[in-house]
Structure formats: structure tokens, C-alpha cells
């Protein structure tokens, strides 16, 4: 830190000489007073200390008689800080670590229990749902069997009806054919041509004949059909 240099300004107050000086002899008296104030700002930091500044100035200069100040700068340097082993803090850290370990284990156990509880509840719920689905599938299977039986019976019944229908109309066709044959037999017509040729060395003989035979048998049914 540099000291302040005091300079007396020109407009300083004039002090009249004392009476002894007026009476013929001189007595010189001069009083000089200097005072200063100093302020320091320190910001301690464990890792990187910051620089701080000191300022000094005269109180008289603050009153208007001029201002002159010197500033000295102190640069900060990095200091190696060693950890202090305090038994109380060591014991407290040990207790905190043990408590944290216990709480961590408790959280893990709670998580496992909650996971097991939810898994068991879900498993039971799924078993109930699976049993419901199984029973419903069994019912559906029985319904499918009944449906297939009904379809098979319906198909068999339909085939029987179709067979009966075919038989009925086939019988009608047979009846018509039989009737037609009977009618053709009742109305017979016989037609024959006979021709004989005899040829020899002495003479030749030729003989021929034509025979037509027709008979009709009328019955009451034929008359109705003709009508």
C-alpha cells in the first residue's frame, strides 16, 4: 500500500499572526493533520479464491481539499486445500450411508413385494378370465355340434323329400308308359307281304300275296281318352 501525499491547495484559509508577532517579534506555528480510512473486501473460496482490492484515502480530501488515492492490487493464487478429517462428520457420514443403505434395501423390498402382489393379482384375474373363456368355448363347441347335427338332419330330410318327389313323378311316367303300351296292344295292326318265286329249267312260277289284318278293341277307357 502506498501512503497518501498531502498537497496544500492555494485557497487554504489564512490565519492572522498572533499579537506577539504584531508587537515586533515573529513566532511561526504550523499544524498538519493527516488521517485515512481503509476498506477491504475479501471473498474467500475454497477452490478458486477471487482477487480483492484495498483502497486508502484521506478523510480531509473527502471534504473537498483535493482527492488523491493509491490502489494496490493483490492477485489471488490457487492454494491446495486438504480435506480435514473431523470425527463428528465422519461418524455422521457413516450413519447417513448406513441409513441410505437400509432405506435403499427397504425400497427394493417394497418394490419386490408390490411387484409380486400385482403379479399374483393379475395371474388370478387371468385364471378367472381363462376359465370363463374355456367354459364359453366349450359351450360354443356344443352349439357347433348341435348346429351341424341340425344341418345334417335337414340335408337328409331334404334328400328324402327330393327322392320321394323323383319317385312320385317317375311312377307317373311309368304309369303313362304302361298305359301307352296297353293302348298300343289294344289297337293292333298287322301288315305282311308274301312273295314266292319258283324258277326252273322247264318253267318259271311266281306267286305273291298281300295280307292286311287289323283289329281294334274299344273299351270304356279308350273312349274317354279319345274324347
Swiss-Prot record:
Localization, UniProt: Cytoplasm
The UniProt annotation puts the region (CAHS motif 2) at 159-177
Coiled-coil intervals = 90-140
Region of interest (CAHS motif 1), residue spans: 122-140
Q: Fill in the misc note.
A: Trehalose, a disaccharide essential for several organisms to survive drying, is detected at low levels or not at all in some tardigrade species, indicating that tardigrades possess potentially novel mechanisms for surviving desiccation involving tardigrade-specific intrinsically disordered proteins (TDPs).
Q: What does this protein do?
A: CAHS proteins are cytosolic heat soluble proteins that seem to contribute to the anhydrobiosis in tardigrades, but their specific mechanisms are yet to be identified. It is possible that protection during anhydrobiosis might occur via the stabilization of vitrifying small molecules such as sugars, but not via the direct glass transition of CAHS proteins themselves.
> What is the protein name stated in its UniProt record?
Cytosolic-abundant heat soluble protein 106094
- Gene name of the encoded protein: CAHS 106094
Amino acid at each position: 500500500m502506498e501512503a497518501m501525499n498531502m498537497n496544500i491547495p492555494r485557497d487554504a484559509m489564512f490565519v492572522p499572526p498572533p499579537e506577539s508577532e504584531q508587537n515586533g517579534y515573529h513566532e511561526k506555528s504550523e499544524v498538519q493533520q493527516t488521517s485515512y480510512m481503509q476498506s477491504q473486501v475479501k471473498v474467500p473460496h475454497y477452490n478458486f479464491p477471487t482477487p480483492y482490492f484495498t483502497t486508502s484515502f484521506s478523510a480531509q480530501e473527502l471534504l473537498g481539499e483535493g482527492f488523491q488515492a493509491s490502489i494496490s492490487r493483490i492477485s489471488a493464487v490457487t492454494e491446495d486445500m486438504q480435506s480435514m478429517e473431523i470425527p463428528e462428520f465422519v461418524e455422521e457420514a457413516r450413519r447417513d450411508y448406513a441409513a441410505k443403505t437400509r432405506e435403499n434395501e427397504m425400497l427394493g423390498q417394497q418394490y419386490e413385494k408390490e411387484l409380486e402382489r400385482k403379479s399374483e393379482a393379475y395371474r388370478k384375474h387371468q385364471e378367472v378370465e381363462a376359465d370363463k373363456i374355456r367354459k364359453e368355448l366349450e359351450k360354443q363347441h356344443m352349439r357347433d355340434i348341435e348346429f351341424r347335427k341340425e344341418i345334417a338332419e335337414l340335408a337328409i330330410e331334404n334328400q328324402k323329400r327330393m327322392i320321394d318327389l323323383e319317385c312320385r313323378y317317375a311312377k307317373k311316367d311309368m304309369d303313362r308308359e304302361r298305359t301307352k303300351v296297353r293302348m298300343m296292344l289294344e289297337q293292333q295292326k298287322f301288315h305282311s307281304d308274301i312273295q314266292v318265286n319258283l324258277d326252273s329249267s322247264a318253267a318259271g312260277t311266281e306267286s305273291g300275296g298281300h295280307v292286311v289284318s287289323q283289329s281294334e278293341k274299344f273299351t270304356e277307357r279308350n273312349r274317354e281318352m279319345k274324347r
